Swiss-Prot record:
InterPro entries to which the protein is assigned, alphabetical: Ribosomal_uS19, Ribosomal_uS19_bac-type, Ribosomal_uS19_CS, Ribosomal_uS19_SF
UniProt name for this protein: Small ribosomal subunit protein uS19
PROSITE patterns linked to this entry: RIBOSOMAL_S19
SUPFAM superfamilies: Ribosomal protein S19 (SSF54570)
Organism phylogeny: Bacteria, Pseudomonadati, Pseudomonadota, Betaproteobacteria, Rhodocyclales
A cellular component annotation (GO) from this entry: cytoplasm
Physiological role: Protein S19 forms a complex with S13 that binds strongly to the 16S ribosomal RNA.
Domain of life per record: Bacteria
Organism: Aromatoleum aromaticum (strain DSM 19018 / LMG 30748 / EbN1)
UniProt-recorded Gene Ontology molecular function terms: rRNA binding; structural constituent of ribosome
Length: 91
């Protein structure tokens, strides 16, 4: 179910503080965060946010098309290694 319009988008407070600090200091380093549940806001456009995927921080460069989505959508947590090849196909 979608989030109510009257509530507005959810963003962790500590992430907003980090984004404001980077915007004022004009720093180019990625912002490291574990908050995959935060919604991408228009203020994030042009920033690089390192989102944790459970093992490492994946750098995500935020573009205008990402606004409204969650940060976790852009840092995949599962790696697909492929299905086992059949023995008949190898012959």
């Amino acid at each position: 179910m979608a989030r109510s319009i009257k509530k507005g988008p959810f963003v962790d407070a500590h992430l907003l503080k980090k984004v404001d600090a980077v915007r004022t200091s004009n720093d180019k380093r990625p912002i490291k965060t574990w908050s995959r549940r935060s919604t991408v806001l228009p203020d994030f456009v042009g920033l690089t946010i390192a989102v944790h995927n459970g093992r490492q921080h994946v750098p995500v460069f935020v573009s205008e098309n990402m606004v409204g989505h969650k940060l976790g959508e852009f840092a995949l947590t599962r790696t697909f290694k492929g299905h086992a090849a059949s023995k008949k196909a190898k012959r």
